[in-house]
Amino acid sequence: MSTPLNVVALSGGTSRPSRTLALTEAILAELAEHLHIKPHLIELGEIARPLGSALWRSELPEAVEQQLRLVEKADLLVVTTPVYRGSFTGHFKHLFDLIGQDALVDTPVLLAATGGSERHALVLDHQLRPLFSFLQALTLPIGVFASQAEMADYRVSSAALAARIRLAAERAVPLFGAHHALRKSA
């Protein structure tokens, strides 16, 4: 079997449990159904305090620096953020402010977000996509937005949301060629 893809998923929520973490895990699980991956999950809540107190990358503790290096070396990056006041969180943005300017050039990024209602769904295209375009990453054409109504007990509970997650994962497969795709027996 081929070398697994290094998939790094950043769950941008700061609490646990969280719908953002649940969505991130559901996306990783679906990607694993279609691609041979080695997943790495970064929970922003676990590094938020030391991350937030650093103005410069050189001020980060080594454990947080390691997480940033994982992001920079990803073959595929999955980013999921809760939506607050129409945008991603400040800690989420601060993490990407500390990522090397050219570190994500041509890195495929699957965008995802959670929000209280569908009125936040445009955050994918109006907030996240411009951020990663600036970083010259390759944002995947299908993102995943999950509203509060589509999740129950911190799990995907909507067939429509599950279908969007599946579509996003399926659309990621061609980027990595047949040697990373998992063969499904009929």
From Swiss-Prot:
As recorded in UniProt, its EC number(s) are 1.5.1.42
What superkingdom does the record give? Bacteria
Chain coiled-coil ranges? none
Q: What induces it?
A: Under sulfate limitation conditions, it is transcriptionally activated by the LysR-type transcriptional regulator, CysB.
Catalyzed chemical reaction(s): FMNH2 + NAD(+) = FMN + NADH + 2 H(+)
Q: What class of enzyme is it?
A: oxidoreductase
Q: Which stretches are transmembrane?
A: none
From the Swiss-Prot or TrEMBL record, what is one GO molecular function term?
Answer: FMN reductase (NADH) activity
**What does this gene product do?**
Involved in the dimethyl sulfide degradation pathway. Catalyzes the NADH-dependent reduction of FMN.
Identification of the protein by name: NADH-dependent FMN reductase SfnE
- Organism, as annotated: Pseudomonas putida
Biological classification of the source: Bacteria, Pseudomonadati, Pseudomonadota, Gammaproteobacteria, Pseudomonadales
